[in-house]
């Protein structure tokens, strides 16, 4: 297989090695601040385009063209770069591809950031609010400690899909160019895909494209979370362990597996997003807790339907369980992807 055709749904030892190296780099290094991240440049491009185009009339049309052109342009750019390098050195192309996979995966940093939120809460509520503001889009200045923990775990579940499973899904379908194109789509949604006065027209297509790109990965993520939860014994959902209970034994939900599936099917589509509710419902089923409620975004109040019926206090062990389960789910996804490439 020629590596420059790796945007096609084909496999081989090259893609197996590329994916494994990229994943190991993320596992060990996370997102090092000393390496410029491609998403930074995507963000600058989006900010530039939004400033130039999001004014006057026909904002929805201009936003649609901008989103589609940005995504296709990213795919073509990465494919062209890899094709150019392949003509000179397949080994160098593999190295560049592995680096881009590394940049597209965010599992290590996601788990680290969520853990830091819970650790910050031990120092004080204001510290927790500031820390969670790094990973959520909602206004955090008035959140309670319980709302800070809930926001962190909701983000963990949602971004396991956006930051790990979905990039892997598009890598399996369209190789490194597809993975990078997905990151552009996801970055567009995170920057302009809001239903407020400024973005509701210009960012409409960006939000819909992201919904389509994440439709299957979000449901795969939910299933992987539930499968990963099998490794944890049951515990009482009435636990009152304090946030600092890092030495408490780890345990899972009181719900048997078939009840978790029923929980997922009941609450997966309750979210305002067609996708975010599925991984969130899966994690809520594992923890036997409740997500959702009223949140403020850019000073405007939004209501998210509740996911779950058990409004118990979340604690430090819930974070530990969630991080481990999300890592196991990520590991399953990596193994499945490697098997696909190695066997084709």
Spans of model-derived segments:
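Hydrophobic alpha-helical transmembrane segments
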Residues: 2-180, 185, 193-344
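RNA/tRNA-interacting regions in translation and RNA-turnover enzymes
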Residues: 190
